């Protein structure tokens, strides 16, 4: 079918990174950019793509990129056939504290820049990681604070965080992430190895 042939995640991601709008064929196929994050200092990026509701074949996936030399190169990509509802963003005041920051997905791939720098000496212990995590946050959250970086949350509440981690044999932990309101209040936090954010954890301890 035409809408199936017109979707190439890597090419769509590269258009987003270059600041260009999606091609007509991408829009015709119902493809939308759910969220994106570029850490220019680390030279990594992640683009979250989906297909609008109503299409018979769902698209929901992330492409990771790393700057190698003067160009962006795809590190990894993947996704599911699950539909992603872009409407009905929850409010933590109505839905409860667990909806303030909900983990959706994550992924990581070996650094292409490190791989090229090593040449024939392909030792995984010397290769860093390019990683991402996706979340849906409540309506009370305006942005995520990741170190010195501020990542604005789109209106639908889905947001993605990209980072680069140093070499290790295992997938890297995330950087500390805080969900922040419009007035600068830290609503909840998620540490490098946490399975639950601080607000959800506090609500469980209080029960």
Task: Indicate where each model-derived feature is located.
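Short loop/turn and low-complexity linker motifs enriched in small/turn-promoting residues
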Residues: 30-36, 48-52, 125
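A general sequence property marking short-to-moderate contiguous segments
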Residues: 4-25, 45-123
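An N-terminally focused, membrane-permeabilizing/fusogenic/translocator signature enriched
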Residues: 23-33, 37-42
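Ser/Thr-rich low-complexity repeats and stalk/linker segments
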Residues: 126-131, 136-205
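Short beta-strand micro-motifs in enzyme catalytic cores
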Residues: 43-47, 131-133
